[in-house]
Amino acid sequence: MTATTATAPTMRGGGRNELPPHLDDNLLTPRFYTTEFDKAAKTDLDIARKDFEAMFKEMEADYNLKHFDRKASLERLSELSPEDKAIYESYLVRSVVSEFSGFLLFKEISNRFKKAGRQELGQFFTFLARDEARHAGFLGRALKAEGINVDLPNLGNKRAATFFPLSWVLYSLYLSEKIGYWRYILINRHLNDNPEKVCAPLFDFFEPWCQDENRHGDCINLMMRCWPGMTKGFRGKLLSRFFLWSVFLTHTLTVCERGDFYGLLGIDPVLFDEEVIIQTNNTSRNAFPWVYNFDDGKFLEMRVQILKAFRNWRESSGLAKPVALSKFVSLILRQFALPMQKTNAVRYG
C-alpha cells in the first residue's frame, strides 16, 4: 500500500527539504497509496445508514478542535544530549511524514467520492483528512521549535503511489489507526505516571491525538461492514491473518530497532510492543472475522525469537547471511500459521 519517492521534494523558494547532518535524509520519503476508487464510490450506505449518520455527526462535531491549541508552545521542556536530541527529532520527522501521508490519502479518497457524486462519503473522509492535517501541523511546529523546517505541501508534489485492492487498503487502514491509538494512549498513560520523562509539551497532546486515531479506526470499520464480502469465508480469514501478522511483525521489528526513543521516555520497548499487540488484537475483534489466539502465549513468545533472528541476519555476512535469513523466514512463517479465533464482529448484509 506504500511507495517511496525517489527524488527529494523541493521546498518553496527553490530549496530542498533537507535535514540536519545528524538526521537521515531517508526519513523524508513519504509513502503513498492508491486503490479502486471507482469501486469504493459504490459503497452501499443504505445497509449502515443509522450507524453512518451517527459516525458522521461525531466526526462533524470535531470534539478535539479546541484541544489542539495552535498558539501552545512546543518548545522542549528539558535540555537533551546531542544523541537524545537526534532521537527525538528523528521521531518527529517520521511522525510528520506519516501523518501527512495519511492526510493525502484521505483527501484523495474524499475528492474521488465527491467527483463520483457521493457527497456524504466525500465529506466523511474530509473529516479524517482534517484530523491528519492537524496532527501533521503540530508535528511540523514541534520540528520548527527544534530549528528544522519541513515543507509539508511540497512533500507531495512529486510522488509515486503503489496500487492495492480496496480490501487491502481498508484492512491495513483499520489496523494503522487502531495500533496508533494504542501506541499513543499507552505512551500517554506512562508519561502521566512518570511526568519527569516528559521532555516536550508535544506529548501533552497525545490524549486527544489517540481519540482521533480511535475514531478513524471506527470510520474505517464502518466502511468494511458495508462490504460484507471482505470479511466472509476463507477470504475474510486470510485477510485477517495476513494483515494482523504483517502489522504486528512490522511493529515488533520497528519498535525494538528504535528502542532508543522509548528508552528516552523510560519505556521498555519489548514490553511496550507486547502490550500494543495484545490490545490491538483484542480491539480488532470488533472489525475482523478472525484474530490471533494469544491464550497459549506462542505468538508473543515467538516475537523474541524473531527479533533475535532478524538482528542475527542483519549482522551476519558471507555464507552465514543466507543461513540466518532462512532461519528468520522460517520463524515468521511459523508465526503466521499460528491458530486464530473466530470473532463476533458486526457485519451488514
UniProtKB/Swiss-Prot annotation:
GO biological process, one term: light-independent chlorophyll biosynthetic process
Reactions mediated catalytically: Mg-protoporphyrin IX 13-monomethyl ester + 3 NADPH + 3 O2 + 2 H(+) = 3,8-divinyl protochlorophyllide a + 3 NADP(+) + 5 H2O
Superkingdom of the source species: Bacteria
Region (Disordered): 1-23
One GO molecular-function entry: iron ion binding
Cofactor: Fe cation
Primary enzyme class: oxidoreductase
Pathway(s): Porphyrin-containing compound metabolism; chlorophyll biosynthesis (light-independent)
Xref: Pfam families: Rubrerythrin
Keyword set, alphabetical order: Chlorophyll biosynthesis, Iron, Metal-binding, NADP, Oxidoreductase, Photosynthesis
EC number: 1.14.13.81
Biased composition annotated in UniProt, kind: Low complexity: 1-10
Record keyword Metal-binding present: yes
Coiled coil: none
Similarity comment: Belongs to the AcsF family.
Function: Catalyzes the formation of the isocyclic ring in chlorophyll biosynthesis. Mediates the cyclase reaction, which results in the formation of divinylprotochlorophyllide (Pchlide) characteristic of all chlorophylls from magnesium-protoporphyrin IX 13-monomethyl ester (MgPMME).
Protein name: Magnesium-protoporphyrin IX monomethyl ester [oxidative] cyclase
Species, as recorded: Prochlorococcus marinus (strain MIT 9313)
